[in-house]
Amino acid sequence: MTEPLRIAVTQLPHGQGLPLPAYQTEHAAGLDLLAAVPEDKPLAIAPGERALVPTGLAIALPAGYEAQVRPRSGLAVKHGVTVLNAPGTIDADYRGEIGVPLINHGRETFIIRRGERIAQMVVAPVVQIAFEPVAELPMSARGAGGFGSTGR
């Protein structure tokens, strides 16, 4: 296994005491993000409602990397709760708190307690591009076939 990429992290005051994000298995792609809501004030998300859940973390990604905030499959399948703008992108030059916009598509109010795993974060390399205007694009086997053009 290669040496892990080192990423600077700051725990904000309301995130103090929570463990840092961690991989749950040896080959996991995403680290679990935890809710940094007050111990005595769980956050309730009613059906059809959304909330920005604080993590109490700020990170400094190295240039050439991004972090994506993605839903946790268990929350989506069991409760209908997912990340609203999935995947959310954290750019390398962002230094603010990581917030997770969750939406409740379920039928019951979903309660988020301090330290609950609410999303996963995947760090990946980024390639920046430069557009090159051309009169015509090269042909491909697919051509301009859009949604559903390769099957169901």
Curated annotation (Swiss-Prot):
Keywords: Hydrolase, Magnesium, Metal-binding, Nucleotide metabolism. It comes from the Bacteria. Transmembrane segments: none annotated. GO terms for biological process: dUMP biosynthetic process; dUTP catabolic process. Pathway: Pyrimidine metabolism; dUMP biosynthesis; dUMP from dCTP (dUTP route): step 2/2. It holds the Pfam family dUTPase. GO terms for molecular function: dUTP diphosphatase activity; magnesium ion binding. It is an enzyme of class 3 (hydrolase). It catalyses: dUTP + H2O = dUMP + diphosphate + H(+). Substrate binds at residues 72-74, 85, 89-91. HAMAP family: dUTPase_bact. Belongs to the dUTPase family. This is Deoxyuridine 5'-triphosphate nucleotidohydrolase. It comes from Afipia carboxidovorans (strain ATCC 49405 / DSM 1227 / KCTC 32145 / OM5).
